[in-house]
Swiss-Prot record:
InterPro entries: UppP (IPR003824)
Catalytic activity: di-trans,octa-cis-undecaprenyl diphosphate + H2O = di-trans,octa-cis-undecaprenyl phosphate + phosphate + H(+)
Pfam families attached to this UniProt entry: BacA
Superkingdom of origin organism: Bacteria
Gene Ontology terms, MF aspect: undecaprenyl-diphosphatase activity
Further remarks about this protein from its record: Bacitracin is thought to be involved in the inhibition of peptidoglycan synthesis by sequestering undecaprenyl diphosphate, thereby reducing the pool of lipid carrier available.
Function: Catalyzes the dephosphorylation of undecaprenyl diphosphate (UPP). Confers resistance to bacitracin.
Annotated keywords: Antibiotic resistance, Cell membrane, Cell shape, Cell wall biogenesis/degradation, Hydrolase, Membrane, Peptidoglycan synthesis, Transmembrane, Transmembrane helix
TM stretches of this protein: 38-58, 75-95, 106-126, 136-156, 181-201, 217-237, 242-262
Name of the molecule in the record: Undecaprenyl-diphosphatase
Length: 264
């Protein structure tokens, strides 16, 4: 398989999985197990491509927050988005400076998929008894920020799953409201991560080793696919639970543990 086709497939995979609660990083690690490993920069760029999709999908909401910033509700919502981002940025930077790196084997990803799937089922069962609430509290904002760090440390956890379900557990029980907040927090989070990685690689003189055609194709594929997925998901969760995604995670994790040789 050519490098360009591999990049295209990885971009599509990123767009499909970044916003579904099934772990994009986990799926990319699994895919790269067979398609060949890519650089951290490549992975961050395609994540940024997927975030472009969020900007496009929520462009009206973003415009509403910007033009209506003088309104108390909009202003507080923006401040809570900022708080979630700052928690992720500060704690994430500490973790990064500590030298934490992604696992090179698939087994930890498989276990994270299974544990995350069980966690989703338990939270769904608990929140089903609660009234629908769409108010983002400061506790929810801080929790979402921490959940994003956990997802970055443990691939297979899923940034969207950990953050959405913690938000639901902390009181933001309406799925669409929780997903919207998490996706909007993802905009500054992923763009900041992309910029940080770009600067680190530029200082190390590693950017010249990137195949920019591959990166560009993967970025566009992730953006286009991500746009379709986010539009679909926001409609889907208005009348459906996340149960199907939880079952998929558990099944995929179990299959990986059964089929892959020990140490893979």
């Amino acid at each position: 398989m050519s490098d360009l086709l591999s990049a295209l497939l990885l971009g599509i995979l990123e767009g499909l999985t970044e916003f579904l609660p099934i772990s994009s990083t986990g799926h990319l690690l699994i895919a790269q197990h067979w398609l060949g490993a890519r650089s951290d920069f490549f992975n961050i760029v395609i994540q940024a491509g997927a975030i472009v999709a969020v900007v496009l999908v929520f462009r009206q909401r973003l415009l509403q927050l910007a033009t209506g910033f003088n309104q108390r509700g909009n202003r507080e919502y923006v401040f809570k988005l900022g708080a979630a981002f700052l928690v992720t940025a500060v704690v994430g930077l500490v973790v990064r400076k500590a030298g934490w790196s992604l696992p090179e084997t698939v087994s930890p990803v498989a276990w994270a998929l299974i544990i995350g799937g069980v966690w989703m089922l338990l939270v769904e069962a608990y929140t089903a008894r609660l009234p629908d609430r769409d108010q983002v509290t400061w506790t929810v904002a801080i929790g979402v920020g921490l959940a994003q760090v956990v997802a970055g440390v443990f691939p297979g956890t899923s940034r969207s799953a950990s953050a959405i379900f913690l938000a639901m557990l902390l009181g933001l029980s309406r799925r669409a409201a929780a997903a919207e907040f998490v996706f909007l927090v993802g905009i500054p989070t992923m763009f900041a991560a992309s910029a940080y990685t770009f600067l680190e690689m530029a200082k190390a003189g590693q950017l010249g080793s990137e195949d920019w055609a591959d990166v560009g194709v993967a970025f566009l594929a992730a953006a286009i696919t991500g746009f379709v997925v986010v539009k679909w998901l926001m409609g889907y969760i208005k009348s459906h639970r996340f149960t199907a995604f939880a079952i998929y995670r558990i099944a995929l994790g179990a299959a990986l543990l059964l089929w892959l040789p020990s140490g893979s």
